[in-house]
């Protein structure tokens, strides 16, 4: 709880600084605040050890849900072919090229090379906004990247889990791997779509009744991505895909609800905007904190050159596959 409070305050501070210095992206400022946070013992010592499962469930899942809600469902339908190409074909191809390229260096084993490749292949909407801040992005390319960033986190996580199993077991079952991929991705889509529509229909009935309470309705809406993510993971389907699809369905509801209760929808959008901004900032605060933590703990020793080579190969391989 103390860790969360400190990270939220750090995120708010970085957002405030970005208002004072608008020329610098808030994400870069959040990185810097995270680095400073580690250097202040009275604060840094209260930050708990990083837990990837908690981070994905409590930060990444709601972020993707709200990003999905900002995207029209019909746009996804129009760009479905490109989404499949970028989130499945491109991600798998990039992972294969990067994985074999890393293994060719002789620094890491083939399974470990594929683990690193799976981590590096997905794009990130937040990082893209930071890099393109102040620049003009072509509309078509911007749309493709936005659509890709909604779904390829799920592809990357699924492929990462498969690479980890390969590393742990010492072999890979291609048929079972493809089947698991289809079940996880397809199950996530189905679960997210059905669950979201049940929630949407229930909320619409509630809105039309005399029992409608703004605070209760907003609370249910805010906790929706957390519930859907952990429920999907409990069913062994992709929780990330489930929350993205649920967000898209909620966008369709929001368009319809504006005619019924515009005040409530406007308030919900403002609340979501605030939460998204804080969560995005928290991601980079954590990244900055961990970066300094790794340096201080001397995780970069005599093998630093190997790490640098791995990073360069991953970057070059991904760029070559994409362009």
Regions found by a protein language model. Give the residues of each.
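Transmembrane helical cores of multi-pass secondary ion antiporters/exchangers
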Residues: 1-323
């Amino acid at each position: 709880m103390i860790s969360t409070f400190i990270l939220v305050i750090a995120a708010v501070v970085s957002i405030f600084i970005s208002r004072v210095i608008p020329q610098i992206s808030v994400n870069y400022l959040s990185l810097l605040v995270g680095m400073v946070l580690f250097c202040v013992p009275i604060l840094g010592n209260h930050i708990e050890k990083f837990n990837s499962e908690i981070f994905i469930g409590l930060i990444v899942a709601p972020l993707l849900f709200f990003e999905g809600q900002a995207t029209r469902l019909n746009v996804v339908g129009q760009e479905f072919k490109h989404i499949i190409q970028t989130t499945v074909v491109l991600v798998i191809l990039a992972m294969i090229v990067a994985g074999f390229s890393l293994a060719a260096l002789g620094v890491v084993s083939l399974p470990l090379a594929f683990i690193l490749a799976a981590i590096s292949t997905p794009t990130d909407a937040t990082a893209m906004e930071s890099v393109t801040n102040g620049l003009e992005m072509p509309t078509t390319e911007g749309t493709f990247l936005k659509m890709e960033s909604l779904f390829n986190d799920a592809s990357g996580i699924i492929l990462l889990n498969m690479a980890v199993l390969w590393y742990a077991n010492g072999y890979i079952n291609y048929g079972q791997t493809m089947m698991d991929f289809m079940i996880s991705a397809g199950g996530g889509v189905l679960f997210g779509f059905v669950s979201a529509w049940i929630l949407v229909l229930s909320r619409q009935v509630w809105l039309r009744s005399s029992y409608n309470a703004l605070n209760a309705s907003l609370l249910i809406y805010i906790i929706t991505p957390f519930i859907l993510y952990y429920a999907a993971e409990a069913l062994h389907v992709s929780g990330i895909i489930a929350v993205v699809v649920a967000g898209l369905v909620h966008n369709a509801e929001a368009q319809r609800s504006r005619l019924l209760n515009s005040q409530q929808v406007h308030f919900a959008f403002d609340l979501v905007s605030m939460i998204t901004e804080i969560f995005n900032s928290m991601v980079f605060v954590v990244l900055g904190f961990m970066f300094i933590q790794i340096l201080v703990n001397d995780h970069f020793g005599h093998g630093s050159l190997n790490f640098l080579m791995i990073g360069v190969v991953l970057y070059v391989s991904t760029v070559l596959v994409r362009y």
